[in-house]
A protein has these predicted regions:
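The feature marks the mature, well-folded catalytic cores of soluble enzymes
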Residues: 1-244
């Protein structure tokens, strides 16, 4: 299923949340309705962690992660790091990265097996991403945009990318990532799909302005429809069991 939500009248859900198969980060300071949408769907399966990064609420922009790990910028405080480590499942590694392009959520997009990264990230950053997230790493652009995390969102089951992505690149990326991909939008025609959407292998959250057509594409490409509901439940249960 896919659900709509808002963070203090902002529809850029991906700016204020980071969702994986093992945990969900949500920004401090949101409304109860915002938190309730996430906790109602996730709290029985994975921890929903209220967090800030360097005192900033845009946790989705600043972090990248999957079921294996969480990457945060170097200016994350010691207190914030400790809170994250305490709240995350024991199997999830949490690592600071000293990187000039510190909005990691904008420069990295990943699932549990592979990551696409901004072409200009440091080579040391690339190694840390590979080691912490346990993924194959590829430098790439999407529709000639270097901010791959802003213009794409992927899971182990599918991905949504910038609406102007050419068919040839869609095919290339789909082969590379080994998942089906679609070019599309969220929030009524917004190309910033990574900013307007968070999704894991069984549930998605979009901004309130996301249309029914956009929501349907999200549910289909990420295989979240009713026809895959039992499969999604099995996936969720398997992931949760592996984390316990």
């Amino acid at each position: 299923m896919a659900f709509r939500a808002q963070f203090e009248n902002h529809n850029d859900i991906g700016v204020f949340a980071r969702l994986t198969n093992a945990y969900c980060l949500v920004s401090l300071g949101g409304t109860e309705n915002f938190y309730n949408v996430f906790e109602a769907e996730l709290s029985d399966s994975i921890p929903v962690i209220h967090a800030s990064i360097a005192g900033i609420r845009t946790v989705g922009c600043l972090t990248a992660g999957n079921k294996h790990g969480l990457l945060v910028p170097n200016n994350t405080t010691d207190q914030e790091m400790q809170q994250l480590i305490n709240a995350l499942p024991e199997t999830v590694k949490c690592r600071r990265i000293e990187e000039r392009l510190s909005a990691l959520g904008n420069t990295i997009v990943c699932n549990d097996y592979v990551a696409l990264i901004h072409p200009d990230l440091d080579s040391e950053t690339e190694e840390i991403i590979s080691d912490t997230l346990n993924v194959e790493v590829y430098r790439s652009t999407i529709a000639e945009q270097a901010l791959v995390g802003t213009y794409a969102c992927i899971t182990n089951r599918g991905g949504l990318v910038h609406p102007q992505t050419k068919i040839e690149q869609l095919d290339e990326l789909s082969t590379l990532l080994q998942i089906p991909l679609a070019a599309g939008t969220v929030n009524r025609g917004n190309a910033l799909v990574g900013s307007g959407l968070v999704v894991n292998d069984w549930v998605a959250f979009c901004g309130m302005e996301t249309t029914s057509t956009e929501l349907s594409l999200v549910e289909n490409i990420f295989q979240l429809t009713d026809s895959t509901k039992s499969t999604n439940a099995s996936l969720r249960d398997a992931v949760v069991e592996s984390l316990s």
